[in-house]
Amino acid sequence: DCAALGARALTFQADLSDEAAARALLPAVVQAFGAVDAVVNNASDFEYDDPGSFSYALMERQWRANTAPAIVLAQALHEHLQARGATGCVVNLLDQKLWNQNPDYLSHTLSKAALEAATTMLAMGLAPAVRVCGVAPGVTLLSGAMEDGEFEAAHRMTPLRRSSTPEDIARAVRFLIESPAITGTTLLVDGGQHLQAQPRDVMFLA
């Protein structure tokens, strides 16, 4: 798709739960393209637990997948941009659930809450070379054991009767990358899902 639009696209793989692999990723991209102006932290692990099944092991896996790599990649972009005398942007993909909490997916939610806090702190600490922002989607793709009908029902459980699509999220990310006066804030792109308090994750209510 990117090539059809006249853009050059390459795929890079890394186990982001491994610190050395995470730190090596951006330099590899720079070597291939010559420069990097933005990082979108979209990789995420999504495993179920709740207050009754919480464990150190799962919390650590969620932290190593969802929180720590985003910080390392922001560090790497900052170093690269400073060396170039340039500016750029990091966008962290969060979750509307941070504004509409329930006890499902406890460790995942905690890891995203830490990333939301890191978004603010990184925006302060990496300025002026790097702006750091967040995008918090709602129900966007099938997850877990959801079937198509359940997903469609969950997707409509918002004030706007629609949640986010991948295209909605991409537009929000692009807007933030292209907006040089915005940093340290998060756009909620969820059809208003965060305005509706729910006792459980929406996938269990559809």
Pin down the residues of each PLM region:
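Conserved mid-core segment of classical short-chain dehydrogenase/reductases
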Residues: 23, 45-61, 79, 104-107, ...
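Catalytic Tyr-X3-Lys loop
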Residues: 37, 45, 52-72, 91, ...
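Short-chain dehydrogenase/reductase
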Residues: 1-33, 46-48, 54
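Conserved Rossmann-fold SDR core element
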Residues: 35-37, 116, 126-140, 182-189
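Catalytic loop of short-chain dehydrogenase/reductase
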Residues: 82-114, 119-127, 139
